[in-house]
Amino acid sequence: MKKLISNDVTPEEIFYQRRKIIKAFGLSAVATALPTFSFAQESSDLKALEYKKSTESTLILTPENKVTGYNNFYEFGVDKGSPAHYAKNFQVNPWKLDIGGEVENPFTLNYDQLFTQFPLEERIYRFRCVEAWAMVVPWIGFELNKLLEKAKPTSKAKYVVFHTLYDPEQMPGQKNHFFGGGIHYPYVEALTLAEAMHSLTLMSVGLYGKALAPQNGAPIRLVVPWKYGFKSIKSIVKITLSETRPRTTWESLAPNEYGFYANVNPKVDHPRWSQASERVIGAGGLLSVKRQPTLMFNGYEREVAHLYKGLDLRINY
């Protein structure tokens, strides 16, 4: 993993490339009518967490209000500020996370167990959106492999499938097809079992020392730092181990633009924009824009490249 330095972290820029797909589906009038909100204030009413601090404590992080105020979470609207606005009353307790499928030991975690079942630790990761913007985030959580080891995958298990909560009464984007970007909910993502078992793959329940804010995927989300952000599914209620590969949400919506693997790759462009460089979200104002080269696997090439040995990454994007 390439060591992060202060220059890896972010000046601010508003970048709405994903809105192009909204236009492609005839939803531009609705999307552009949505309000833009200022960056969220740092939250003081979220649960403080007990966790092992990262040894990378000298790193300068993306400001908390940018991480909590600049989000893609289409269940709460397609505008970057919509999730912070529309999710502010989202109820995450009680919560159930069901783990099942091709496992010997299916089980369920309640809200409190999300924070206590496994020891929590801080992981400072790069975060790269497919829209070509980036952050550095101090996630708090536990390795997904710990949860999978408890479930004991069977020999048939090849994929790990994740489902976001389906609750149209709380999630306006699920209730209104246009407000939610034309997605067929619930949101579904998946990893190969090898990807899911990798030590970098995190189940996050917090950031900046506190429980996740609703707009960041409370109470529990996936974080896969070498993949584009849409793979890091939010507000998960079900994890199913499967013998067959599912069709994931963005792959189903636009398969020519969003592949199953979604590995960060500067040599494989999105059909409508380059992935060779990225804009960073950080402490500066709108005029302090910084662009930096995109790193293969988002800087985690040494750790994860072996997972894709022999795989054509241009075809399997």
Swiss-Prot record:
Broad class of where this protein is predominantly found: periplasm
Signal peptide interval: 1-40
Enzyme class per UniProt: oxidoreductase
Gene3D superfamilies on file: Oxidoreductase, molybdopterin-binding domain (3.90.420.10)
CC cofactor: Mo-molybdopterin
Binding site for Mo-molybdopterin: 71, 74-75, 129, 164, 216, 221, 232-234
Record-level Gene Ontology MF annotations: metal ion binding; molybdopterin cofactor binding; oxidoreductase activity, acting on a sulfur group of donors, quinone or similar compound as acceptor
Keywords, alphabetical: Metal-binding, Molybdenum, Oxidoreductase, Periplasm, Signal
SUBUNIT field: Heterodimer of a catalytic subunit (MsrP) and a heme-binding subunit (MsrQ).
Protein name: Protein-methionine-sulfoxide reductase catalytic subunit MsrP
